[in-house]
Amino acid sequence: MKGILVAGITAVLVAAVESLSCVQCNSWEKSCVNSIASECPSHANTSCISSSASSSLETPVRLYQNMFCSAENCSEETHITAFTVHVSAEEHFHFVSQCCQGKECSNTSDALDPPLKNVSSNAECPACYESNGTSCHGKPWKCYEEEQCVFLVAELKNDIESKSLVLKGCSNVSNATCQFLSGENKTLGGVIFRKFECANVNSLTPTSAPTTSHNVGSKASLYLLALASLLLRGLLP
């Protein structure tokens, strides 16, 4: 009897030590920064997930945060995925997601973008956005260095409503993230990416301007110079 009691107490203590607490918050517009962590359910007691999406676009998706407990194993102790898509100099969409193995995540706003580099003169991507739909018609936008073209369709939702975003532009997204999200209906940090396509701008060859008129003009200029030379020779004694 005593042995059974000791074993029971030990099991309770081990369970208490292994329990995980995460911030559990899903919000539009309001920040989850001041939310308090609470104990995770037994079926999602492996890691904490924290994701946020913010934009300066004229769409319903201005600020979205989703923090929850997960049964997922992180690829690292703390794995952060972050990228920004630029549509213009003033318009952008920023996404960051953390997977924190066995511990609470830090504020996702700490994962800031690296400083932007110079604009690459040969790198252009179609840039546009829509609140709904499956595509948008973009105008060319010059990318910063180390950016690539991105076309994504994302669905962000909570228990009450769902909002969609269609986006094309220049992004600093990594090739690993492109590969992971490529295809359809991939979920990262609670956000469903219905479509995520990347194109390396370095592989794009700029369209060459027609040279016909330039060549004709050059030949005409040479002909006039030769004719003028002959006339001058005939007039001189």
From Swiss-Prot:
Its main location: membrane. Residues 125-176 form the UPAR/Ly6 domain. One of its GO terms (cellular component) is extracellular region. GO terms for biological process: defense response to Gram-negative bacterium. Keywords: Cell membrane, Glycoprotein, GPI-anchor, Lipoprotein, Membrane, Secreted, Signal. It is a lipid-anchor; GPI-anchor. A lipid is attached at residue 215 (GPI-anchor amidated asparagine). InterPro entries: CNF-like_PLA2_Inhibitor. Expressed in the large intestine. Preferentially expressed on the epithelial layer exposed to the lumen (at protein level). Glycans are attached at residues 45, 73, 107, 118, 132, 172, 175, 185. The keyword NADP does not apply. Residues 1-19 form the signal peptide. Highly N-glycosylated. Not O-glycosylated. Residues 216-237 form a propeptide. It is found in: Cell membrane; Secreted. Belongs to the CNF-like-inhibitor family. Secreted protein specifically required to prevent invasion of Gram-negative bacteria in the inner mucus layer of the colon epithelium, a portion of the large intestine which is free of commensal microbiota. Prevents invasion of flagellated microbiota by binding to the flagellum of bacteria, such as P.mirabilis, thereby inhibiting bacterial motility in the intestinal lumen. Segregation of intestinal bacteria and epithelial cells in the colon is required to preserve intestinal homeostasis. This is Ly6/PLAUR domain-containing protein 8.
